[in-house]
Amino acid sequence: MERAMEQLNRLTRSLRRARTVELPDDNETAVYTLMPMVMADQHRSVSELLSNSKFDVNYAFGRVKRSLLHIAANCGSVECLVLLLKKGANPNYQDISGCTPLHLAARNGQKKCMSKLLEYSADVNICNNEGLTAIHWLAVNGRTELLHDLVQHVSDVDVEDAMGQTALHVACQNGHKTTVQCLLDSGADINRPNVSGATPLYFACSHGQRDTAQILLLRGAKYLSDKNGVTPLDLCVQGGYGETCEVLIQYHPRLFQTIIQMTQNEDLRENMLRQVLEHLSQQSESQYLKILTSLAEVATTNGHKLLSISSNYDAQMKSLLRIVRIFCHVFRIGPSSPSNGIDMGYNGNKTPRSQVFKPLELLWHSLDEWLVLIATELMKNKKDSTDITSILLKQKGQDQDGTSIPPFEPPGPGSYENLSTGTGESKPDVLGGKQEASADCQDVISMTANRLSAVIQAFYMCCSCQMPPGMTSPRFIEFVCKHDEVLKCFVNRNPKIIFDHFHFLLECPELMSRFMHIIKAQPFKDRCEWFYEHLHSGQPDSDMVHRPVNENDILLVHRDSIFRSSCEVVSKANCAKLKQGIAVRFHGEEGMGQGVVREWFDILSNEIVNPDYALFTQSADGTTFQPNSNSSVNPDHLNYFRFAGQILGLALNHRQLVNIYFTRSFYKHILGIPVNYQDVASIDPEYAKNLQWILDNDISDLGLELTFSVETDVFGAMEEVPLKPGGGSILVTQNNKAEYVQLVTELRMTRAIQPQINAFLQGFHMFIPPSLIQLFDEYELELLLSGMPEIDVSDWIKNTEYTSGYEREDPVIQWFWEVVEDITPEERVLLLQFVTGSSRVPHGGFANIMGGSGLQNFTIAAVPYTPNLLPTSSTCINMLKLPEYPSKEILKDRLLVALHCGSYGYTMA
């Protein structure tokens, strides 16, 4: 009866408290009953359960083998913690990682738990498996108030973890100022190194902790490197911590020059150095001028080293340009002051800011004299010999006994007389054209061109940084004009110099024209790389389409009105952000990424030429499109043309191909290339043939009675449009017919669609600068925008006709098709362009190729062979005039020469 009553009472208590009132007999089950109560600090319930239980309060459970005392300390359950301590819980019991309850209380800032643990003799000096004590945890988290209480119980405040780091190390690294002061006040060793030799100051600088570094330096911390020689300053510069560098320089002024010298270290990230020097230069005008003057001096020294032929060109070139880039960056962002702004130092102003360029004048003087010297020798060779292809520098490599002769050093200021006398064993003799080159002679241009060009690049950068954006320094223009012949000699010898060092051409149209013929002769691939290098210069992420985007930057468009909705969102979007990356999402869809962007461009490229918008009309061959001169039927046509330009500019910027092809004349408009009468064939082949006929024949006695005016249909009414002022009264004659043809071409191909072209270019140039796109011709621009079309050679052969003596089985024809199979896809496209004027095959294949009068098969006509004769073409009738070459090798050579030399144009069959 008594036992039954006891069970009834237990049942009643359990139901009232909604929990068990007795612990299970085994510790494993019991501990999981108690743990949630301990975490909630339900000390009465825990006390009641423990009162009649044999539960071991030090029982370790779980994967990390912690006791309930660990749980209480970790959660801040102070009442349960005291209860467990009174029940005999061990305050120094370590879990599997070596942590005691005191470690956990310190890590989580549980002050009351820490105090109670210390009352019950918790050992503050116990280290966990990583060597960390409770004091380390307080230092890591900056719990200064708790640290004050704990250090009173610590026997050694400099106790080390497994890496030899003390609490002071970690407090400095995490920037906890009051914690650092508390540890120092408690006797922490301010210069104690860890196992790698890193001091607390080193740790503070590694994370740019300016305030803790200042506290350490104020208290006498030594400036020491680690065992690998890495200094606190090295760490500050590597992280771009300008404020911390400023503190170091305040206490160690000698470090200023160390930072300046670091600009020569190519292992340091340039943008980090810029950040540091930018911060330092903002502190005062005098500091700003000091930095610039020091950088100018270092640049001058490096520049003269670069001009030394015995130096390592690659290393010195990179060093000079790196220093100059940093110099120019700092110059532009000087400290705020009433006089701050662009300082035209090269235009005669003698202000303090312009004077920072003075040390560089020594380098520019050496550059100028080098170029004058080479120009003099070029002139001498022109007079002395018909062979002026090289200037030779005689220099002995070794004497007969094997003794090395000192290498040639370029002249420094005041030493040019040695170069001209040629006296002394180690001094060079500049040979005239009449002297015979020996095996030990070197081409002076080959030896110096790259070096001098790199210095020219540095000179341009320094000139430009003093000019307002978009303006070219008059001094630099004068310099290029003065040395025009030598610079052209450089690039003729080594065209790569243009891509490596003559970047100024892209920013100076007045100079670009001098070198354009050389640039256009360079491989398409090299020009593409140069194009994108400068197009994306300064952008933070080269993987543009994949860069993370802000939700506000996503282009949200509707599929059912993709053209109009895209036009609206693109017009409102930030242009700079669109250059950096594109993110597109279709309304009501979740998908994003490159696939969606690709689909967006594909759909838009089809919509741009959708007849419903009346923006473009098909050309005569049915494969290309031309702006519609009557697009004004759409009230928003100019806005849409601007949008079309934006889309093509964006596609080119992000290397996304569009599924659309334009007429040659429209590509020319984009490039700024004048159109000619041959371009008329794309919209009116018969009229193009008539213009060709006028040019090819004498019209003096034909009585055509043409004037410099034409009749044009303007919305159903015929109007006479003069080709030039008073054109209606000016007769077309044999003498002025070429002008007439050009003017009528411009009317048909340009004037009639000028507003549309202007609107398109306005959008296109938002993303593609005119100076960059002019690197290409109209065929290459098509390739950039739309990619390489595929050509089915078997279909080509099947739909080819032969005339003037050729038949399908002739050896020359067999060789021709073998060559077509052998050449690259790019060269096949060139061949198709060469003969038909188009790079694409129309829908349905070669059977549907159009000529001047309708369908016209590709035709090969025989031409008598003469040595070096090139193939020609008549594009109006798709005819290749192929000489009867004696071998396949000669045929291939002559054909490729014709294709790559751009022998395009119309001839009459």
UniProtKB/Swiss-Prot annotation:
Region (Disordered): 396-433
Catalytic activity as recorded in UniProt: S-ubiquitinyl-[E2 ubiquitin-conjugating enzyme]-L-cysteine + [acceptor protein]-L-lysine = [E2 ubiquitin-conjugating enzyme]-L-cysteine + N(6)-ubiquitinyl-[acceptor protein]-L-lysine
Parts of the chain that traverse the membrane: none
Domain of life assignment: Eukaryota
Sequence ranges assigned to domain HECT in this UniProt record: 574-909
N-terminal helix important for homodimerization, as annotated region: 1-21
Biological process (GO), any one: ubiquitin-dependent protein catabolic process
ANK repeat intervals: 23-55, 64-93, 97-126, 130-159, 163-192, 196-226, 228-253
One example GO MF annotation: ubiquitin-protein transferase activity
Entry's localization field: Golgi apparatus, Golgi stack membrane; Cytoplasm; Endoplasmic reticulum
SMART domains reported for this sequence: ANK (SM00248), HECTc (SM00119)
InterPro entries linked to this entry: Ankyrin_rpt, Ankyrin_rpt-contain_sf, E3_ubiq-protein_ligase, HECT_dom, Hect_E3_ubiquitin_ligase
Keyword Ligase: no
Keyword check for Transcription regulation: yes
Subunit structure: Homodimer. The homodimer is autoinhibited and stabilized by its N-terminal helix. Interacts with RAB1 (RAB1A, RAB1B or RAB1C), RAB4 (RAB4A or RAB4B) and RAB11 (RAB11A or RAB11B); in a GTP-dependent manner. Interacts with the 26S proteasomal complex through the 20S core proteasomal subunit. Interacts with RARB.
PANTHER family in alphabetical order: E3 UBIQUITIN-PROTEIN LIGASE HACE1, HECT DOMAIN UBIQUITIN-PROTEIN LIGASE
Domain comment (free text): The N-terminal lobe of the HECT domain is important for interaction with E2 ubiquitin-conjugating enzymes.
Role description: E3 ubiquitin-protein ligase involved in Golgi membrane fusion and regulation of small GTPases. Acts as a regulator of Golgi membrane dynamics during the cell cycle: recruited to Golgi membrane by Rab proteins and regulates postmitotic Golgi membrane fusion. Acts by mediating ubiquitination during mitotic Golgi disassembly, ubiquitination serving as a signal for Golgi reassembly later, after cell division. Specifically binds GTP-bound RAC1, mediating ubiquitination and subsequent degradation of active RAC1, thereby playing a role in host defense against pathogens.
Name used for this protein in its record: E3 ubiquitin-protein ligase HACE1
